């Protein structure tokens, strides 16, 4: 599998090599007008999310789709649909929407999340990123979600339903 390489080009990161992406498109042909990010599919998700700090995970239904936990020596965090926030939540920030990079990402791929973050940062859209074994999820505040998807489309990402 060939590793992706990125170069900085006119304020967004563009791919200069693109091979071996499972379940994704191919690198555009030389001289093609097709965007360089073709093949990176962005899939918006329906739920409205909460980002929470919890005392423990006892009240969390981890069998629900889209439940993400993170535990460190300093805190226990939870990202879940708004309706699934447990009672033992210490703090919460509601009003997040999410999209994921469709397909499975190989661990050798680099710069994918950085490219998305750069496009959104250039438009002053804050993100909360979560990585799983298969792929990356990106959350933005609900008020910024449509603008984020539009910015990514403009940068050549393919938004699918």
Locate each region found by the language model:
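A structural feature that tracks compact, well-ordered secondary-structure segments
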Residues: 104, 108-143
